[in-house]
């Protein structure tokens, strides 16, 4: 194997994004994925909603971070996203930690745009104080997979599981190793 500066283990979102980021910064990168394709586990099958922070009404810092991350993601990967006609958030009438008006007030104070569609739902639900529709997006996992496959094909080794001994050898050879696997 040729000497590389950075070894990244895991070909999901984190591994692929970090690989691209380090390459853009001029580093030499080797990406290893244990499966026969990148994006073949959670990064492909997750709901992949790109959210603005609507589901964090009790955490202002998290809403701010979500909005910042949303803008950053769209600046880098806008071609990998699609608009959603419906992106609904509902507040329960009973057993909720927050009432609808407080929720809407908090969301408005964070400058998040939404439409209250509580009275115009095309279906009936019980125990709802209200429903809002937002302008969030979804990440198209098929587009993302193809994008990263095309852009990382020259540095990606698929079908290769990296074990602890491999990591030790990479480090001994002077590589920086970043483990981007899930639940390891």
Stretches with model-predicted labels:
Residues 47-130:
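Dinucleotide-binding Rossmann-like beta1-alpha1 core, especially the glycine-rich loop
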Residues 139-184:
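Predominantly flavin-linked oxidoreductase catalytic cores and closely associated redox partners
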Residues 23-45:
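Glycine-rich FAD pyrophosphate-binding loop
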Residues 4-30:
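N-terminal Rossmann-like FAD-binding beta1-loop-alpha1 element of flavoenzymes
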Residues 14, 37, 183:
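Conserved Rossmann-like nucleotide-cofactor binding loop
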Residues 133-138:
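Glycine-rich "substrate-gating" loop/helix at the edge of Rossmann-like oxidoreductase active sites
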Residues 10, 33, 92:
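Short beta-strand/turn micro-motifs composed of small residues
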């Amino acid at each position: 194997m040729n000497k590389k500066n950075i070894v990244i283990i895991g070909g999901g979102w984190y591994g692929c994004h970090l690989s691209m980021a380090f390459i853009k910064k001029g580093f030499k990168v080797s990406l290893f994925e244990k499966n026969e394709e990148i994006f073949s586990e959670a990064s492909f099958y997750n709901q992949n909603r790109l959210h603005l922070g609507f589901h964090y009404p009790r955490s202002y810092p998290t809403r701010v971070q979500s909005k910042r991350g949303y803008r950053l993601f769209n600046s880098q990967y806008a071609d990998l996203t699609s608009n959603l006609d419906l992106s609904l958030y509902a507040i329960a009438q009973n057993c909720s930690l927050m009432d609808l008006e407080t929720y809407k007030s908090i969301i408005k104070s964070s400058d998040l745009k939404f439409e209250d569609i509580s009275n115009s739902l095309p279906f009936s639900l019980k125990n709802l104080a209200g429903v809002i529709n937002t302008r969030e997006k979804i990440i198209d996992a098929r587009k993302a997979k193809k994008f990263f496959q095309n852009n990382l094909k020259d540095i990606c080794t698929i079908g290769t599981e990296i074990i602890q001994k491999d990591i030790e050898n990479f480090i001994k050879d002077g590589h920086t190793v970043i483990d981007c696997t899930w639940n390891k």
